């Protein structure tokens, strides 16, 4: 037998703190006491026993004095146990012994025999044997979360398991009446009778050899930690039951995080506020992961301003749910173990991602101001993962604006009037919807069907409040003009200056312009009095022939905006109130630098063309008609109408562009009209041509007469 005067501190092992830490039994034993000399039976064991997971601790009464130095562990016959290694501490009056080598099992108990010399007899020393016991916990009694706080929506709960005998003692007609509840630590500890505890947020249930206690988050003694929108609750709890001959003490520290997890397309995030505790491990799906292994296991931990755990969705399970399309992500349970207040405590939560609905995933509350909805699709947004190469939107005419294969991400910029986007009016909102399709990444090609396809409805809306205008009306507005049937007609004209008062007539072409002289152009809708329509330019360009499709071409306006690759940009001019329907007009000035070559004698005829469309400001495409040139050309191009909806209009005649060194400069007046010199030039050309024709006819007549004369001779 080995006996050491100093040994380990007697703290329960880590396994016990995880699963048994909440239970110890402290009682005065009045069980069988055997003596070698029957006349020397001791009526009671002079001490108490505390039972741990793999050992017991005996605490002797101080009345024993120096006799404790002679205490030892023996077998039931009083013989030394050679394999028993125990620790005797005379100063603390304790003896610690492991169950495995120092006890034997008797009727479901770990039984140990202690002896020490009793020298109260003046004649001879006699040895007294004491049997002390701790219960044997039956295998399989605990579930995987035994010893952990179970978190629910409004309360936390903890379960203490009994052993045979203790359960019988507490199973009387009023088993709960002997219990008292102590909550809090140190000076803040409060002792409550069971009846008081029931009225202050606690509930106790004893059945089937176990005791369950439920604690509301606002119960007496509960400490509340909060940070932002995250909350954590913790309470030290001790239950004491006193009966003749024994005292039962059950203790635990309950801890619970009450907030639901948040989810995005790739991760599930759990947030816990700052509190005096440190995370030790994370357990789920029969895996226990230490903190230093979290990152390698797909879990990212942030510890600044509280604790945040980001779980990759590849770790989560999926299940069919009426709330989600097509699956809901969740963990069947998640156990977090912390070290706090010199204790190891655990809590169990049941996290799952919250979904919007079975038919829609809302891409954003409001559609963008320039008439789009922006959608992000991640490869791991579903399980199994998506094949991003098979993604398509609506009628498949839309292509992704961004593809990031390494991030498993695709972004769409879907126009509200294209790609098959639909709209409807509902509760004062204009709701736009489209559908995204994709195939699963690991789907065998031979099993393609409708069920194998991922479908996600995306939507955004404009509310009626977005269209409100505050006005002060002093008179009734004029009646809305009736809609005029028939095709729309446009015209493109040029003006002498930016007053736009009198355009050039058809007889004034070609209109002459020199270097540094702007060309003032106007596109307008003809023969319409509907104030609700708006003219929107698409493209304007110049060609060297009358054919709008001929090459080369010079861009003037692209997607309704000045051409940003031209150093001499087009200037838009506002349409004032001098016209009845300003929205029926578009005015702009073109710089001649874009067309004139470096040859000082350069002259050229240039033809101007524009494509445009008509917008109905009362219909659902109004946001598109108000798009700003701050949007990139590529984005604006996606909002444009089809080629069938656009109309192309050209100037009635060409513009004659001349450089400063041209010999015709003096022949042009300040208004740009050709003068008599230029008219004489044109007349001279006609006369020369006529003279040539006459000379040709005369030659033919002479040759014919000469031939006739020769034949007559």
From Swiss-Prot:
One GO MF term: acrosin binding
Glycosylation sites: 83, 191, 457, 527
Site entry: Cleavage: 167-168, 635-636
Propeptide residue span(s): 636-713
Extracellular side: 36-682
Chain ranges passing through the membrane: 683-703
GO BP annotations listed: binding of sperm to zona pellucida; prevention of polyspermy
Keywords, comma-separated and alphabetical: Cell membrane, Cleavage on pair of basic residues, Disulfide bond, Extracellular matrix, Fertilization, Glycoprotein, Membrane, Receptor, Secreted, Signal, Transmembrane, Transmembrane helix
Post-translational modification: Proteolytically cleaved before the transmembrane segment to yield the secreted ectodomain incorporated in the zona pellucida.
Chief place of localization: membrane
Paired cysteines (S-S): 51-134, 84-102, 367-460, 398-419, 540-610, 561-629, 615-625
Entry's localization field: Cell membrane
Domain notes: The ZP domain is involved in the polymerization of the ZP proteins to form the zona pellucida.
PANTHER family linked to this entry: ZONA PELLUCIDA SPERM-BINDING PROTEIN, ZONA PELLUCIDA SPERM-BINDING PROTEIN 2
Family: Belongs to the ZP domain family. ZPA subfamily.
Protein name from the UniProt record: Zona pellucida sperm-binding protein 2
Name of the gene: ZP2
